[in-house]
């Protein structure tokens, strides 16, 4: 495999050449603690950004296996790492200058849902993160010095801060994993009790608008009717009460954006 120094030499050699010369840098490069893969190079600085990925082997990342030894914990950790990585690279986007999308650094930006995403995947041997980089140019003339800044000055710190356990907020990670375990416990209880849904007391259901994930300001917290209230004893959180919706036809009424579908 080619080394990071090979990438720097190649980028230096194509500086001020026509933009298609960037395609010569496609491939994987060893940065010692992680592998940088340039998977697709954009056609010009105004086209969709280039596709890039990094891989960090578990032996170097150091995340304990018990943090991702079930599908739901794995998804929770992937989601957390992706959110961290999105914030890290977002601070550096467009710090490198040029025309069009030059200097853009971005990845998937999750909403409130915790879902399995290809932007960050924990595999058998490594963690992979996929993102986009706008390869810098002035007009259609390569400005490889700015791409060297991205790959050698900006990116290593982002990877170190996010994908190495020793640099992470371990208490926050533990909280996310405990929440994932509690959520899975509730899902299992729904099946066991023949329920289709559970709405916890204290939930804030109304949204700002029909296209917003943010809670409505000044909204009233949900309070279950006594006739429908049950209590579940979660392994992490402990007892939690709320409304159980049994299998069958249930009619829910209310004003617009008041949380009926939430």
Model region roles, listed by residue range:
Residues 240-262:
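Glycine-rich phosphate-binding P-loop
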Residues 1-194, 205:
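N-terminal accessory targeting/assembly segments
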Residues 205-241:
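N-terminal pre-Walker A segment at the start of P-loop NTPase domains
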Residues 132-134, 199-201, 246, 253-255:
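Generic beta-strand/beta-sheet core signal
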Residues 191-195, 201, 262:
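Carboxylate/His-rich catalytic cores and anion/metal-binding grooves
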Residues 143, 209-211, 256:
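A short secondary-structure junction signal
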Residues 52, 129, 195-196, 230, ...:
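A broad, low-specificity signal marking well-ordered, structured residues that form hydrophobic/aromatic
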Residues 123, 130, 234, 239, ...:
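Histidine-centered divalent-metal-coordination microenvironment in nucleic-acid enzymes
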């Amino acid at each position: 495999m080619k080394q990071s120094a090979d990438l720097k030499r190649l980028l230096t050699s194509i500086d001020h050449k026509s933009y298609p010369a960037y395609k010569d840098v496609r491939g994987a490069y060893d940065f010692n603690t992680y592998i940088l893969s340039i998977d697709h190079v954009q056609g010009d600085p105004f086209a969709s950004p280039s596709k890039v990925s990094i891989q960090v082997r578990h032996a170097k990342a150091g995340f304990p296996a018990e943090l991702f030894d079930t599908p739901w914990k794995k998804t929770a950790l992937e989601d957390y790492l992706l959110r961290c990585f999105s914030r890290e690279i977002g601070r550096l986007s467009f710090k490198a200058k040029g025309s069009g999308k030059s200097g853009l650094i971005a990845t998937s930006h999750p909403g409130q849902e915790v879902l399995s995403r290809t932007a960050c995947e924990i595999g058998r041997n490594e963690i992979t993160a996929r993102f986009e980089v706008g390869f810098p140019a002035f007009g259609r003339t390569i400005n490889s010095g700015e791409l060297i800044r991205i790959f050698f000055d900006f990116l290593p710190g982002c990877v170190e801060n996010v994908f190495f356990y020793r640099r992470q907020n371990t208490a926050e990670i533990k909280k996310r994993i405990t929440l994932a375990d509690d959520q899975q416990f509730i899902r299992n209880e729904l099946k066991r009790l023949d329920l289709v849904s559970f709405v916890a007391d204290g939930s804030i259901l109304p949204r700002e608008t029909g296209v917003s994930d943010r809670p409505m300001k000044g909204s009233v917290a949900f309070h279950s009717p006594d006739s429908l209230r049950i209590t579940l004893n979660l392994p992490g959180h402990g007892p939690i009460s709320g409304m159980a919706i049994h299998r069958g036809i249930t009619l829910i009424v209310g004003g617009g954006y008041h949380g009926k579908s939430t």
